[in-house]
Amino acid sequence: DDPNDYMAKCGAKWLHKNGVNALCISPGKKNYSHVNNPLERIETAIAWLKSHGNRKIGIMGMSTAGMDSLVAASYFPDITLTFGLTASDFVWQGFEQGNKDGCKEWPIPGASTLSWRGEPLAYMPFVYEHPVYWQKIEEETKGSGDIERSTCLFIDSEKAREHTEEEMIMVENIKGKLFLIGADDDPFWEAGKYIRRMDQRLKERPHTCEYVPLVYEHGTHFVLPESMLRMALPVGLKFVMKFIFKAAKDYPNECEATRKDIDRRLSAALKEWIQE
């Protein structure tokens, strides 16, 4: 989302701590929009990493970037370790963030979040247009105890029309090892449901990847390794989380246990991948 994003830097430091190099990709400085972002950027990044002596390629993404990671891994067989955190199993309509008519986010008609060879990828259109899109987020967020809630955008859009096969992510094409991570109390979208659908898709289709679906009852949208978040907030992590997510306030110990379990699993996966 931003080459100087604080959490992205903490993610890079966490990967360094686990013995791997890290390269962050973003559409531009302070650009948190997702409009036809070219997959070629990831293709170029892979080529650059290989030309600079990296013999293995992995990808890690959270939130919208989690979706990006799964799509990229399904396109590029050089990627042999994929961490998709709170990732959807479908491509979304493109959206922009900023300030437009008092709205902080709005969908872009006719645009996808991702593109390939100059063409937008097939995507799920949001049922709400600007400005109703942001108004729905505000309505759901009000009084929820979460800093933001947007599940209605996805639930209502899925109810409005069935997904086409073209907009679903072909996770069966992913190589190596795949980790799908999310929580059922994610206030942004139904991360747990999407992971279960990907699990079912992989069971029904031939695939070569070794995949690990991890759905936690409690974890919020921040299903990140505990030690990564502690790099960002060395003091008062649980306290801050309570102000961001209601689930972190109601289930602080369970959410912390989730993050610690993710930390153990992903750190172990990186160690094993390095040694292969």
Language model regions located:
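Alpha-helical scaffolding within the catalytic cores
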Residues: 6-12, 159-169
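C-terminal catalytic histidine-bearing segment of alpha/beta-hydrolase fold enzymes
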Residues: 196, 204-276
